Regions:
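Long, mid-chain structured domain cores
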Residues: 53-147, 151-161
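Residue at a conserved register position within TPR or TPR-like alpha-solenoid repeats
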Residues: 95-96, 126, 163, 211, ...
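Solenoid-like repeat scaffolds
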Residues: 78, 107-114, 142-151, 180-182, ...
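Generic helix N-cap/helix-start motif at coil->alpha-helix transitions
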Residues: 50, 80-89, 113-119, 149-156, ...
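Alpha-helical adaptor scaffolds
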Residues: 120-136, 205-263, 267-268
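Structural motif corresponding to the intra-repeat A-B loop/turn of tetratricopeptide repeats
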Residues: 96-98, 129-132, 166, 214, ...
Length: 319
């Protein structure tokens, strides 16, 4: 979270110099009150300020202005308040309050109290404010939690879903499987098992992509070829074509490329179809495929390079 983006809240605070000492509250110290709370005091014609209003504003100043001159005085006051964290938790959970202020409260609790529930509250409010943009910070926090506690079920559960959202199905599956080993609640287990079942095809594709990237073509082939007769995803055929190309099985590569491109004529797929035709001796067909993609202005950075090299070869053959 970018703390600086919340500093505008300092302009919504009014500072009061108490005339007399009030317990831990000292003279000659500027104590903060939210302007909206100050307005209510004036509106209701109150002479005294409830110390709770000071306590509500102090964490905002402490979080947003680390060099504030009365920082130590504020911290001393907070130390004297029994269960101050519970008081602030109540404010952070108040759905009628400003979300940014609630988030600052949660941040303060997370940073100053050793309670995992305050971390969870902070992440919850972070997600409420930033939606999907909060995921990277949430992942970092939950991964640190898991590193320090291998039985942190909730962290594993959330990490499984976060990586699923990012379409990183390998990590998602790994975290979900660790979670399942720890979870005893049947309903939760069934939920996660259902998600893993839905994501199996994506996991398989991603794992195959990984093996292709590290040139482990046999491992990629073994994953892709499983249940090939029931394959509903054209990416299975596309990556099988890539594997066959890389292992020199050009006839099979062409067969898979044709199958992959039946329902999807994307630039990536058509490049592979052209390469497979070229490797199978169908130079004219390969050129025709790439020329068609160029005319459609739907091509990859490599399409033009492939086309130029193939045309050069055809020209040399025709001389």
């Amino acid at each position: 979270m970018n703390i600086d983006s919340f500093k505008y809240l300092l302009s919504e605070i009014f500072f009061i110099d108490l005339k007399d000492e009030r317990g831990a509250f000292k003279k000659n110290v500027d104590y903060p009150v939210l302007i909206k709370d100050m307005r209510n005091i004036v509106k209701e014609n109150k002479e005294d300020i409830d110390v709770k209003l000071f306590l509500k504003a102090m964490p905002i100043v402490l979080v947003l202005d680390n060099n504030f001159k009365h920082k130590e005085a504020y911290e001393e006051v907070i130390k004297t308040v029994k269960d101050f964290d519970k008081f602030l938790l109540h404010e952070a959970l108040n759905e009628d309050a400003d979300l940014d202020i609630r988030l600052i409260y949660a941040y303060y609790l997370k940073e100053n109290y050793d309670d995992i529930n305050y971390v969870y509250l902070y992440i919850s409010l972070l997600e409420e404010k930033y939606k999907d943009k909060a995921i990277d910070e949430a992942i970092e926090i939950f991964e640190n939690i898991y590193l320090n506690n291998k039985e942190a079920k909730y962290a594993l559960y959330k990490l499984g879903y976060y990586y699923r959202f990012k379409k990183d199905y390998i990590r998602s599956k790994a975290y979900f499987e660790k979670y399942l080993k720890l979870e005893n609640e049947l309903e939760k287990k069934e939920e996660v098992e259902g998600v893993l079942s839905l994501d199996y095809e994506e996991y398989k594709i991603e794992l195959a992509e990984y093996f292709i990237g590290v040139k482990k073509f046999k491992e990629a082939y073994d994953i892709l070829i499983q249940n090939i007769d029931n394959a509903k995803d054209d990416r299975v055929f596309y990556y099988l074509s890539v594997v066959m190309t890389m292992t020199g099985n050009f006839k099979e590569a062409l067969d898979y490329a044709i199958e992959a491109s039946k329902d999807r004529q994307s630039a990536q797929y058509m490049d592979q179809l052209a390469i497979s035709n070229y490797n199978s001796g169908n130079l004219d067909s390969a050129i025709a495929i790439l020329e068609k993609q160029m005319k459609k202005e739907d091509y990859t950075p490599s399409t033009k390079e492939y086309l130029e090299k193939m045309k050069e070869q055809r020209d040399m053959m025709n001389k």
